[in-house]
Regions:
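C-terminal catalytic "cap/lid" subdomain
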Residues: 1-77, 81-366
Length: 366
């Protein structure tokens, strides 16, 4: 009898410290073990999307063996990524082929998520791949990404992919067992096994700011992304990718193995709101609101951004652009899609009985 899985579709982010050895070379033994687990999941009926780091680290190792001349940081990243991505995807292709599976490469950039059209086009591409039994392997296209518009790291990218593709779970494989209740280097520290969306403020106080050896991010980034994705209705698991069989353990719910599970919010948000939630980097302007509007927007009842509660419009945006909603103290309330241009918004600001500047259906509150 075939084993049935809890999830229909998952995204798996594999960190640089899982895929590379201390000298920066690819850990092909670990890659093969992860591919083995993905193959098992496919036989269980689970669709798997891989978000894989490792290209820059692999390219760095290869080029430094050749004695490459010193480069500026941007040129170095582009060179290492271009060389390393070929090596990385070739390894994946060979490993999956050995298991009678087909993988496909998806290179993307933050700008590719900036408009709803581009967002849906990417989703269609990956849905087509999955429908034909192809395992997408996603990475940021570091060769042409503009530094100012790069993802924080692949944790951020994996969160976008998981929500865009309506995954039931996002598994972030790192080099530690999860979120700890203290410094992971201290023996008395323990892994926090479960974090509900209501427990996030307490758990956040334990987060260390330290970054990984080869990646751009750290646990702080992972925690932030996990919190956001879980609030959007997708479970998030942070686990140690160096543990044997860890991917199968977390999918099967084996709690004898240490890992942190962020429980999904009971009410998932719409596909459109998921896109808006991850569009903060593309906000074209700001809508500042008064205290009454701020309380209404962050309360339990669904509320739109009404002109009567608006105190200031900043920036020049057009209808349907993403805008940031700002509280009186300067903090971000959320993001939404503008129903007016900035020029039109200024003419109705403070007025009653006008249609919303941002309707609730197009508003994501953080």
């Amino acid at each position: 009898m075939e084993e049935q899985a809890t999830y229909r579709r998952i995204a798996v982010k594999i960190g640089s410290n899982v895929l590379t050895r201390s000298d920066g070379t690819l850990n092909v033994t670990r890659m093969s073990a992860i591919v083995d687990q993905v193959a098992t999941l496919r036989h269980m009926g689970v669709e798997v999307i891989l978000v894989s780091s490792g290209a820059v680290a692999a390219g760095r190792s290869m080029m430094r063996r050749r004695g490459v001349a010193p480069l500026d940081a941007v040129s170095e990243r582009m060179l290492f990524s271009a060389v390393g991505q070929v090596r990385l995807i070739n390894r994946y292709y060979d490993f999956f082929s050995d298991r009678s599976l087909t993988c496909g490469q998806v290179l993307t950039m933050k700008e590719c998520f900036s408009t709803r059209h581009h967002y849906l086009n990417q989703r269609h591409c990956m849905n087509t791949m999955l429908a034909h039994g192809v395992i997408p392997i996603v990475n940021e296209n570091d060769t042409i990404s503009v530094t100012e518009l790069m993802f924080t790291d692949n944790d951020e990218l994996s969160g976008l992919i998981a929500t865009m593709m309506e995954c039931q779970a996002l598994v972030i494989l790192s080099n530690i067992d999860g979120v700890y209740d203290g410094n992971p280097d201290f023996p008395q520290s323990k892994v926090i096994t479960d974090i509900a969306h209501t427990d996030v403020p307490n758990a956040a106080s334990f987060i260390q700011k330290k970054k990984s050896s080869f990646g751009r991010g750290g646990m702080s980034t992972k925690f932030h992304i996990a919190q956001k994705v879980a609030n959007e209705g997708c479970q998030v698991i942070i686990a140690n990718g160096n543990r044997e069989g860890i991917l199968l353990d977390v999918v099967r719910g084996n709690r004898k193995v240490p890992y942190t599970l962020f429980h999904a919010a009971p009410q998932p948000v719409s596909s459109l709101k998921k896109w808006i939630a991850h569009s903060e980097g593309f906000a074209k302007g700001e809508i500042h609101v008064n205290e009454g509007a701020s309380q209404a927007l962050t309360g339990e009842t669904a509320s739109s951004v009404l002109p009567v509660g608006v105190t200031r419009i900043m920036g020049e945006f057009e209808k349907d652009d993403i805008v940031r909603i700002v509280a009186p103290d300067g903090t971000t309330i959320g993001y939404g899609r503008a129903a007016y241009s900035a020029a039109k918004a200024r003419t109705v600001m403070g007025c009653k009985a006008k249609r919303p500047l941002v309707h609730y259906d197009y508003l994501y509150v953080e």
